[in-house]
Amino acid sequence: MSGTRAYNILVLPGDGIGPEVMAEAIKVLRTFNSSSMQFHLQEELIGGISIDTHGHSVTQPVKDAAVAADAVLFAAVGGSKVDHIRRGLDGPEGGLLQVRKAMDIYANLRPCSVDVPSREIARDFSPFRQEVIEGVDFVVVRENCGGAYFGKKVEEENYAMDEWGYSTTEIQRIARLAAELALRHDPPWPVISLDKANVLASSRLWRRVVENTISVEYPQVKLVHQLADSASLIMATDPRVLNGVILADNTFGDMLSDQAGSLIGTLGVLPSASLDGLPHPGKQEKVRGLYEPTHGSAPTIAGKNIANPTAMILCVSLMFRYSFNMENEARQIEDAVRAVLDRGLRTPDLGGNSSTQEFGDAVVAALQGKY
């Protein structure tokens, strides 16, 4: 069809509640199909279900499909019968690590704002006093392809070791992305870089390269170096101090982004994006990305139609924003989710009695102006 923009998306539902929440995200995505925009979906196996079917947490054809796709939607893995005997890259979670590595999506972004998905959710579920979390607005930018998670490993009966290495090139590219993201705000957000330069050699290199890269190439961006453990304390006591772009390596970024979920009160509503760059504002271009909720596979509630699809639906919003440079559509989804939550339609984890499908249907109705 002439003038139709086509987007090829790889869909990886995975294990546990993954297929259920993914179905609702796809339902939302399909509402944007039109004469000018079409989404072509390819669904494949990953995680425990892939091990059960193929003997591997992810197959080479799936990794190839991820590299070829314009974007990847991933739900959850784990909770399978092989979890206790298959670990690392051989286990269910290893499939996701392999896909990230194959795609070279080196930057993981986890936004944290009291306004997304809903101020009402933060008010009702955050364990923090409202005056502590009021105004919290930051994004954790985590290096996604290096560090301890991908380094050499030794695991013996009485000794184990994880190599925690980084190169200058790996640090430079994530520092540049963090600075570019900071510049998208007016005035520019600060970049708060986390490390343990007082004890770790890799962190000393991290601090030096981040300093040299941002101070020279992005002088208009304020750069703050913060020890990671100190940042964790700040996040628990005065989180607005961290407003801006929090830049961290794979390990510290993983920890701090999960802690950020406690400010909102639940990981069940928070999406994340893993990218190989950022789109240029105002241009019709595609950036390779993988989008996943921050929650797990929740096998104890799988198949019961009670899982919360909010985070998975918001992954579609992030995909529109970062892979397809479609800010208006991204905001439409966020506004629709907020409208549904603020009117009290919630799944059991948020104190409601709505089903997974009912929540997805309500978001679609809100997008269509019928809610």
Swiss-Prot record:
Binding positions for Mg(2+)? Answer: D229, D254, D258
The record ties this protein, via PROSITE patterns, to: IDH_IMDH
What does the UniProt cofactor note say?
A: Binds 1 Mg(2+) or Mn(2+) ion per subunit.
Q: Could you say which residues bind NAD(+) here?
A: 79-93, 296-308
Annotated compartments: Cytoplasm
| One GO cellular component term | cytosol
Task: Give the pathway.
Answer: Amino-acid biosynthesis; L-leucine biosynthesis; L-leucine from 3-methyl-2-oxobutanoate: step 3/4
Enzyme Commission number(s) of this protein: 1.1.1.85
* UniProt GO BP: L-leucine biosynthetic process
Query: Under which name does UniProt file this protein?
Result: 3-isopropylmalate dehydrogenase B
**Protein's organism:** Aspergillus niger
What taxonomic classification does the UniProt entry list for its organism?
Answer: Eukaryota, Fungi, Dikarya, Ascomycota, Pezizomycotina
